[in-house]
């Protein structure tokens, strides 16, 4: 089944991460390889994807399609990340691999590097989500300003009104900004 756009965007990120991994691995550029993996985990996953989807895992019904899609993505993610981190964190990845029993191989080090499907490379989706991330960053700055002024406690107390031009409104059609920005409500208005 088709994954939601956020998961598709993250698969696009994995596609590019893997391309860079292969390039750096071939030329023994392990420092850059590790830096890119770390950046992906801290910025793309922790500060972005997990921040948005954690409530889906904890709060949505067990059978909800969004929760199922999140779990499908997380399963894809762990298998790929284990293979990418294996040359760098050999003992840690070996232990995780043995606990998860992903495949019948006795060791993560007997696995091939991931073969990422080319359809994960989606430049249109990347462009759209790069714009959404910019909007999210502006919204988060506004929320932090209100938080610093002690007008709100958490982002969930915020009700956003996002002013966009007509072109941007069409681009972001169907996006739930309250979920993207982790607020109680978000409305789009034409500027």
Where are these regions (language model features)?
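Aromatic-lined ligand-binding clefts that engage carbohydrates, nucleic acids, or primary amines
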Residues: 34, 38-39
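Active-site phosphate-binding and catalytic loops of NTP-dependent enzymes
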Residues: 144-151
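Acidic, turn-prone loop/beta-hairpin segments
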Residues: 1-22, 50-142, 155-164
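Short helix-adjacent coil turns
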Residues: 25-32
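Conserved oxyanion/phosphate-binding beta-strand-loop segments in alpha/beta enzyme cores
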Residues: 42
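A broadly conserved sequence feature marking short terminus-proximal activation segments
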Residues: 149, 157-191
């Amino acid at each position: 089944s088709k994954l939601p756009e956020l998961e598709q965007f993250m698969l696009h990120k994995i596609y590019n991460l893997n391309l860079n991994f292969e390039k750096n691995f071939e030329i023994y550029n392990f420092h850059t390889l590790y830096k890119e993996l770390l950046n992906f985990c801290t910025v793309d996953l922790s500060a972005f994807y997990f921040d948005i989807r954690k409530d889906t895992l904890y709060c949505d019904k067990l059978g909800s399609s969004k929760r199922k899609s999140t779990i499908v993505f997380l399963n894809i993610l762990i298998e790929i990340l284990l293979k990418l981190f294996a040359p760098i964190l050999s003992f840690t990845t070996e232990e995780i691999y043995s606990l998860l029993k992903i495949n019948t191989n006795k060791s993560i080090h007997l696995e091939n590097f991931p073969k990422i499907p080319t359809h994960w490379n989606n430049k249109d989706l990347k462009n759209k989500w790069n714009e959404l991330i910019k909007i999210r960053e502006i919204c988060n700055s506004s929320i932090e300003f209100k938080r610093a002024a002690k007008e709100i406690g958490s982002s969930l107390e915020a009700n956003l009104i996002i002013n966009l031009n007509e072109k941007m409104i069409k681009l972001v059609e169907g996006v739930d900004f309250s979920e993207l920005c982790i607020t109680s409500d978000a409305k789009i208005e034409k500027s």
